[in-house]
From Swiss-Prot:
Segments of this protein annotated with the region Disordered: 149-178
Pfam families linked: Mt_ATP-synt_D
Stretches with biased composition (Basic and acidic residues): 165-178
Keywords recorded for this protein, A-Z: CF(0), Hydrogen ion transport, Ion transport, Membrane, Mitochondrion, Mitochondrion inner membrane, Transport
Keyword Mitochondrion applies: yes
Protein role: Mitochondrial membrane ATP synthase (F(1)F(0) ATP synthase or Complex V) produces ATP from ADP in the presence of a proton gradient across the membrane which is generated by electron transport complexes of the respiratory chain. F-type ATPases consist of two structural domains, F(1) - containing the extramembraneous catalytic core, and F(0) - containing the membrane proton channel, linked together by a central stalk and a peripheral stalk. During catalysis, ATP synthesis in the catalytic domain of F(1) is coupled via a rotary mechanism of the central stalk subunits to proton translocation.
GO cellular component, one term: mitochondrion
Any one GO molecular-function label of the UniProt entry: proton transmembrane transporter activity
GO BP of this protein: ATP metabolic process; determination of adult lifespan; negative regulation of ERK1 and ERK2 cascade; negative regulation of TOR signaling; proton motive force-driven ATP synthesis; proton transmembrane transport; regulation of mitochondrial membrane potential; response to oxidative stress
Gene3D superfamilies noted in UniProt: 6.10.280.70
Protein name: ATP synthase subunit d, mitochondrial
Gene behind the chain: ATPsynD
Compartment annotation: Mitochondrion; Mitochondrion inner membrane
C-alpha cells in the first residue's frame, strides 16, 4: 500500500544517469542515495496508522471520559498532505523548453541543409591538389589572394593593410566621435 503513495513520483534512474555529464556523476550519486534513503523511510511506515482498540483502553483506564476525550481528539486530528505547488511550474518549464527545442531543431535542420549544399558545392569543385591559383580564385573569390585587383602588403593581415580601422575606431565613428 505504501508503494502506491510514491509510485507517481518514481524516477527512471538509468535514463537519468545516461544524461548526467561525467563531471557531475558524484553529485548525481549523492542525490540518488539521498532519494533512496527518503523512499526507504517513507516505505518503512504504513500508509495509514494502525487502528487503536479504544474499547480495550476504556476498560484499562480508570478515569472516566479520558479515553473518550483522547479518542475524539485523535479522530479530529488530520495531518494535511502538502499540496504540490511545484509540478505546475515544472510542467510550464517543460513546455517552454520544448518550444525552444523545436526551434533549435528547425534551425539545426536549416543549418544541415546549408552545410549539405556547401558539401555538394565543394565536391563539385576541382580537388585542391589539382587546382591552380586561378582556379582557386574563381572558386573562392572572397578568400583568394588577388594581387592584381586587390594588392596587399606583407604580412597580409587586415591590421597591416591601408585603410584598416579597428573596432574601437569604427565604434567611435558610429557614435560621432572622431
Amino acid at each position: 500500500m505504501a508503494a502506491r503513495r510514491i509510485a507517481q513520483s518514481s524516477i527512471n534512474w538509468s535514463a537519468l544517469a545516461e544524461r548526467v555529464p561525467a563531471n557531475q556523476k558524484s553529485s548525481f550519486g549523492a542525490f540518488k542515495t539521498k532519494s533512496d534513503i527518503y523512499v526507504r523511510a517513507v516505505l518503512a511506515n504504513p500508509e495509514c496508522p494502525p487502528q487503536i482498540d479504544w474499547a480495550n483502553y476504556k476498560k484499562l483506564v480508570p478515569v472516566a471520559g479520558l479515553v473518550d476525550s483522547f479518542q475524539k481528539q485523535y479522530e479530529a486530528l488530520k495531518v494535511p498532505y502538502p499540496q504540490d505547488k511545484v509540478s505546475s511550474q515544472v510542467d510550464a518549464e517543460i513546455k517552454a523548453s520544448q518550444s525552444e527545442i523545436d526551434a533549435y531543431k528547425k534551425a539545426s535542420e536549416q543549418r544541415i541543409q546549408n552545410y549539405q549544399k556547401e558539401i555538394a558545392h565543394l565536391k563539385s569543385l576541382l580537388p585542391y591538389d589539382q587546382m591552380t591559383m586561378e582556379d582557386y580564385r574563381d572558386a573562392f573569390p572572397d578568400s583568394a589572394l588577388d594581387p592584381l585587383n586587390k594588392p596587399t602588403f606583407w604580412p597580409h593581415t587586415p591590421e597591416e593593410q591601408v585603410g584598416y580601422k579597428s573596432k574601437e575606431q569604427l565604434e567611435a565613428e558610429a557614435q560621432g566621435h572622431h
